[in-house]
Amino acid sequence: MSRYRGPRLRIIRRLRNLPGLTNKLVESKKNQASGSDQSNQKKVSQYCIRLEAKQRLRFNYGLTERQLLNYVRIARCAKGSTGQILLQLLEMRLDNILFRLGVVPTIPSARQLINHRHILVNNRIVDIPSFHCKPKDIITIGAPKTYQSIITKRIEAFAKDQIPDHLTLSLSEPKKPKGFVNYLINRESIGLKINELLVVEYYSRKA
């Protein structure tokens, strides 16, 4: 299954707010329903609940079905909580790191910067959005002038307290902001509200 490129509002109306996909906020159809309407709704099956959690994770991080399944398989083979390791793998992707640093408004826009070869990791150009960042990695945003003003305005508007503790943003060189990966992200700093166990359960027979 290919990556979704359709209207983003349609997705967040169905799956609720996804900060990585879009910074627009909408009230989901579930919340818009009146009390009488809710009482008439059929009971949602456990499969549908797990499917929705999986879809929220996939669309927020901009993954294909195959990519997410591969991440689940990697998480299952690692020591520790499969769900937390899965979230860790997704949060440590280069495109997500740029998003969490506040350099770009969404993960798709981070992916564009990376694909255009404007991002360096440890002084080497990386053009793979799924690149796995590690502690002590240094990420340099070497965007051309056309991007610099946009990035500068974005960083100025982004509150520093929104940057999670495992990351640090340095503006000592305004034209080349740098991000530092301090350590692996912990569960409390995950940017998406989700029950990762539902995702693991969804893939229990596939991974």
Curated annotation (Swiss-Prot):
GO molecular function: rRNA binding; structural constituent of ribosome
Protein name: Small ribosomal subunit protein uS4c
Record localization: Plastid, Chloroplast
NCBIfam families (alphabetical): PRK05327.1, rpsD_bact
Family, per entry: Belongs to the universal ribosomal protein uS4 family.
Cited SUPFAM superfamilies: Alpha-L RNA-binding motif
UniProt function note: One of the primary rRNA binding proteins, it binds directly to 16S rRNA where it nucleates assembly of the body of the 30S subunit.
GO cellular component terms given for this protein: chloroplast; small ribosomal subunit
Gene Ontology process terms (BP): ribosomal small subunit biogenesis; translation
Complexes and interactors: Part of the 30S ribosomal subunit. Contacts protein S5. The interaction surface between S4 and S5 is involved in control of translational fidelity.
Record-linked Pfam families: Ribosomal_S4, S4
InterPro entries: Ribosomal_uS4, Ribosomal_uS4_bac-type, Ribosomal_uS4_CS, Ribosomal_uS4_N, S4_RNA-bd, S4_RNA-bd_sf
